Regions:
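Histidine-centered active-site/metal-ligand motif
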Residues: 160, 171, 192-194
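Active-site acidic/histidine proton-transfer and metal-coordination neighborhood
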Residues: 66-165, 174-175, 185
Length: 199
């Protein structure tokens, strides 16, 4: 296991190269990145940083609009292939609708149609997908993958070992989910870990 960070606001201000240099100088060994590019991969290698997880471009993969979903799926596959090409191994995703009032039932129905295609591509590329359990904004908390019930349904639809979770206890605590019990149930699905203070 290597300790790294997600990109804080100051990293966007100074640029990825200076941020990577700061990480290396301060003893960090890894970094989570935006959608991976050749330049970001080169910078990580130059500074001896392992690529932790790489964000996918969010273009509305759970949209009710089929045209939006097709575009999102195409970009998602490109992001996964770029992770493989430029030295990454894990794709970080938030599975949420572009309309926060969209029902979970609708989101699950859309997920069941489109995510098997995403994961099939990840399997071909040898890339892991880690679902961030961020529940989304109140009052809807519309995102999938933030409760045990939702995770069970997700893995029932897509049982592939290439689909797992980014274990972040803070998000579970926020909506009063027992994060230790959840870890016991889904420990074999953990592909990445985030830690932060929470109450």
């Amino acid at each position: 296991m290597k300790i790294g960070t997600r990109m804080p606001p100051f990293a966007l201000e100074v640029g990825f190269e200076k941020y990577a240099n700061w990480l290396a100088e301060n003893g960090f060994e890894a970094v989570d990145t935006p959608p991976l590019t050749a330049d970001i991969g080169r910078i990580c290698a130059t500074h001896g940083l392992e690529i932790g997880s790489c964000d996918a471009t969010d273009l509305g993969i759970l949209s009710k609009d089929a045209a939006v979903r097709r575009k999102a799926l195409s970009q998602f596959k490109k992001d996964i292939s770029a992770i493989k090409r430029f030295g990454g191994h894990t794709c970080f995703v938030v599975i949420g609708p572009d309309d926060p009032s969209q029902s979970r039932q609708t989101s699950v129905e859309i997920f069941s149609k489109i995510y098997p295609k995403v994961v099939e591509h990840a399997e071909r590329e040898g890339i892991q997908i880690a679902i961030e359990p961020y529940p989304g904004p109140a009052p809807y908390y519309p995102n999938l993958g933030c409760t045990p019930e939702s995770l069970r349904r997700i893995f029932e639809i897509v049982p592939s070992a290439n689909l797992g979770i980014c274990y972040d206890p803070s998000h579970f605590a926020r909506i009063q989910i027992d994060y230790l019990r959840l870890l016991h149930e889904f420990g074999d699905r953990v592909r990445h870990v985030h830690l932060k203070d929470t109450e």
